[in-house]
Regions:
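His/Asp/Glu-rich metal-coordinating catalytic cores
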Residues: 1-130, 149-163, 182-184
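C-terminal regulatory/interaction regions
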Residues: 85-86, 90, 109-241
Length: 241
């Protein structure tokens, strides 16, 4: 498998077709299941879905309606980007994208018809000075504290277009991948030293908004459900513990 999770209300309406996989397993049999197991040690199953994340992002836009928002997420999370665009349209905000992988993935998603761009929402990053702070949102790479990513350059004051100011609100719509914690903390520290407010998933109780990230990997109960349905002769966990 690749990365997977069970989603009751996916943004694109395409659910994990476990019924079809079960049919194949019953008819042909599964000799070996090589399953990505990144979150297999996390108890239970997901208690919220991507629509909940979108709702939380909308809450942030409403709560900080006079502030410039900078949202960092994984560039491969097309559904997350779709949610940000939808909420930005609702809030009357313009959206710019920054980061090579972010722009590349967005272009591929557009060509594949995997994302819908609301009319008159996307602008160029260099045009941010044309809009009031409360009407501008930047979506960028760097949620893992990568040294050369857009967000880290902002945190160090080295970005040529965006200089962090004390009215900015930076949102991490992500979790730190194990091993990246110190890099994320370094970026957060830099952003706060530059003067911005930082909102991180898992710490949203400090701001009153809901969850800002949903893992793309199944939890323990999800793995049990998949293995039980496919009933392979052999099982090999990969890409995890």
């Amino acid at each position: 498998t690749g990365d997977w999770r069970f989603e009751e209300n996916p943004v694109d309406g395409k659910k994990f077709d476990l019924e079809r996989l079960t049919e194949i397993a019953a008819k042909e049999g599964i000799t070996l299941l090589m399953n990505e197991s990144t979150n297999c040690e996390s108890a239970g199953t997901h208690t919220h879905g991507e629509p909940d994340i979108q709702k939380s992002i909308g809450q942030v836009m409403e709560q900080y309606q006079h502030n410039r928002l900078i949202i960092s997420c994984f560039s491969s999370q097309i559904h997350r980007i779709q949610g940000i665009l939808t909420e930005a349209k609702r809030a009357g905000r313009k959206v710019a994208f920054a980061g090579y992988s972010m722009i590349q993935n967005l272009e591929v998603a557009l060509r594949a018809g995997a994302i819908t761009i609301p009319k008159d929402v996307i602008v160029k990053m260099e045009d941010l000075i044309k809009y009031p702070d409360g009407k501008f949102t930047l979506v960028c790479t760097g949620s893992q504290g990568e040294f050369n990513a857009v967000l880290n350059r902002m945190a160090s004051g080295a970005h040529r277009h965006v200089k962090i100011k004390n009215t900015d609100v930076v949102v991490f719509s992500s979790n730190a991948i194990p091993g990246n914690e110190k890099y994320v903390v370094r970026t957060v520290d830099g952003l706060m030293r530059e003067g911005s407010r930082v909102i991180q998933n898992g710490k949203t109780h400090l701001t009153g908004v809901g969850p800002l990230h949903l893992s793309g990997h199944g939890y323990y109960d999800d793995h049990v459900k998949l293995i039980t349905a496919l009933n392979p002769t052999y099982y090999m966990p990969i890409h995890g513990e």
